[in-house]
UniProtKB/Swiss-Prot annotation:
InterPro entries: Ribosomal_bS18, Ribosomal_bS18_sf
Cellular component terms (Gene Ontology): cytosolic small ribosomal subunit
NCBIfam families the record matches: S18 (TIGR00165)
Amino acid composition bias (Basic and acidic residues), ranges on this chain: 17-32
Highest taxon listed in the record's lineage: Bacteria
Gene Ontology biological-process annotations: translation
Protein name: Small ribosomal subunit protein bS18
Organism (species): Brachyspira hyodysenteriae (strain ATCC 49526 / WA1)
Taxon lineage: Bacteria, Pseudomonadati, Spirochaetota, Spirochaetia, Brachyspirales
Phosphoprotein is among the record's keywords: no
Function, as annotated: Binds as a heterodimer with protein bS6 to the central domain of the 16S rRNA, where it helps stabilize the platform of the 30S subunit.
Amino acid sequence: MDLENTENVENNNNNEEEVKAKGERKAHFNKELNEKDGRKKFFKKKVCYFCKNNIDVLDYKDIKLLKRYVKDSGKIIPKRLNGTCSKHQRLVTKAIKRARNIALLPYETRY
């Protein structure tokens, strides 16, 4: 009985090596499934950075933090892309506009 089990294990290992040699991938069955209908989740819900770290006051002089929410062209990234909640997105927008007014951050560039 032990010999049969060891032979089966060796055969399985050989089969896996053959599959890898052919460039095929093994199927993965540990996918996250939706609890309601059993389908695969297509996106991961983003968590607000400020809510997670209990930040209530945003300083317009904190340029390093504000640059995370501004594109290279100078546009403010919308909340659906950066994952902030509505409350903190308003605070971020206000802080960015204040920083622009004082010339700490650039306005939009078209080039």
